[in-house]
């Protein structure tokens, strides 16, 4: 978060054009609290109890969950087929957790997957707030607000924790990668997509996370999934795919122009 914050300070010209509108502090606060603050707490706790591969599969619940919240708060229409897809994906999530086996990478997969689900709820709340705010603000200052609020929120927590042992070179490279390419780059692109597309269509791309997570967990962490877990993964993805079909189109509201 701190690395991304310093990068955003270099974009002072774009941030200087941020024009706060009275009353928006509630949405801005809720957006920042949901993600990155609570989201990353639940995410970090989840990965202490479940494997990266299983946590990645739980993220497949985000699109139908975001669609449900968009229906409630943004009045985006969701078909019965989409709701059926959400139910199927949730059943797959429960199956994935129950079929999980304890191992070196997943000491308590049921708890870990439940915490990951809580992280997805936070992410869905964040998406709804961002979509609403993008009608009035550019994605650049909204993403910068995420970075700044995350840095302020996590700094006291970092100071009270014991300093971890790390090798300077690889650890510094990992920190810079996360700060520049994830917190700044990935979030900025994701926020631009949410601002320019219907929320249900933008979040569908998060379905790629489980695929990449499983590939890299197998490649880098030597993790594996049982046949039951693989079947549950297929059920989750099937439910998510069904949830994206036949959704009634709604016009996307005008968004703020991204400053040069």
Task: Please identify what each model-predicted range represents.
Residues 23-32, 78-90, 137-146:
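Cytoplasmic-side transmembrane-helix entry/capping segments in multi-pass membrane proteins
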Residues 49, 75-77, 136, 193-196, ...:
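Helix-loop interface residues and adjacent transmembrane-helix termini in multi-pass membrane transporters
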Residues 4-8, 29, 69, 78-100, ...:
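Hydrophobic transmembrane alpha-helices of multi-pass small-molecule transport proteins
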Residues 11, 29-49, 68-69, 95, ...:
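Hydrophobic alpha-helical transmembrane segments of multi-pass membrane transport proteins
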Residues 14-16, 74-75, 96-101, 160-162, ...:
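Short helix-capping/hinge motifs at transmembrane helix termini and TM-loop junctions
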Residues 54-57, 80-83, 141-145, 201-204, ...:
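Signature of the 12-TM Major Facilitator Superfamily
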Residues 5-8, 66-68, 72, 104-161, ...:
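Transmembrane alpha-helical segments that form core, pore/gating elements
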Residues 10-19, 43, 63-87, 211-231:
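C-terminal transmembrane-helix exit sites in multi-pass transporters
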């Amino acid at each position: 978060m701190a690395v991304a914050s310093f990068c955003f300070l270099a974009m002072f010209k774009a941030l200087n054009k941020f024009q706060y509108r009275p009353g928006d502090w509630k949405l801005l606060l809720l957006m920042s609290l949901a993600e990155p603050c609570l989201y990353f707490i639940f995410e970090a706790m989840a990965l202490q109890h479940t494997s990266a591969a299983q946590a990645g599969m739980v993220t497949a619940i985000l699109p139908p969950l975001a669609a449900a919240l968009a229906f409630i708060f943004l009045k985006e229409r969701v078909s019965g087929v989409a709701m059926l897809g959400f139910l199927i994906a949730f059943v797959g999530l429960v199956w994935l957790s129950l079929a999980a086996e304890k191992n070196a990478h997943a000491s308590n997969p049921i708890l870990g997957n439940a915490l990951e689900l809580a992280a997805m709820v936070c992410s869905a709340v964040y998406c709804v707030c961002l979509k609403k705010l993008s009608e009035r603000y550019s994605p650049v200052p909204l993403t910068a607000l995420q970075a700044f609020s995350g840095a302020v929120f996590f700094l006291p927590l970092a100071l009270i924790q014991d300093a971890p042992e790390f090798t300077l070179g690889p650890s510094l490279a990992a920190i810079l990668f996360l700060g520049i390419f994830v917190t700044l780059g990935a979030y900025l692109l994701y926020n631009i997509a949410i601002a320019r597309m219907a929320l249900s269509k933008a979040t569908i791309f998060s379905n790629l996370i489980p695929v990449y997570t499983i590939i890299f967990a197998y490649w880098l962490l030597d993790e594996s999934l049982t046949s039951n877990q693989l079947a549950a993964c297929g059920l989750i993805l099937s439910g998510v795919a069904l949830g994206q079909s036949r959704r009634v189109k709604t016009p996307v509201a005008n968004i703020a122009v991204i400053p040069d």
